């Protein structure tokens, strides 16, 4: 893995502290697209929602970027916000725009590397080069590279052109959604990375315990409700979904998160299939990119870069979640 230092690409970097714990850097670009261009919760104003103005840079392998693809699909914004998909291999040059094997290349500028998008926005940028990136074609800059904020923009800022009937962050449920996110993000979404990229036994076991305690908590919650916040699909579900989808094919083996599979949890496994079968979601899933990225890119974890053939997965199989009543 690498990063930019004063606008120059450095290909050697590893994100662990003195105790061997994986440390995720905060996202640096935190502006918001709003319906009228007024400033959002953070950053500057001037980013008005307009069809055709914004572009997403994503990886089909990345769970954080996958969130944005799901919201783009469900909110019917495919003709409003364009997209470029990076290659699944993350090597010495970071994310690349090699246009093969399901990757699109850089459909805006024809660049070779994602880090060139970052330096196009800020020639002296220092920090990691991550996906997703929400790009403003008009101002030629990065609006935001924090997935949790991008999905909230997609949820409401473009309702004039998308499906305004869907609201995954409704006002009356926000407190509970935020509370669920505060459990799921550190323990599960980031927890698998904390286990997988740990460089000490102590750090690995700490992350491992926290991860499976949180999964047990969510499993119990889903025994009482169809979704994480009652009987209504919300942002909290989609934030968890992208991690659950990758758990059995990647995190169990590659990140050593092997106490139990999602398939071993009755409620979580049925819930995962339920979400996968929401119209529009399956089209955002690329298991080939997911598996080849993790197993092929992380040489420190998998030096031979052999990609497992299994497991057999059928996310389209029937589920039992319809036993819960629907939200009024």
Label each region the model flagged:
Residues 1-328:
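C-terminal alpha-helical interaction module
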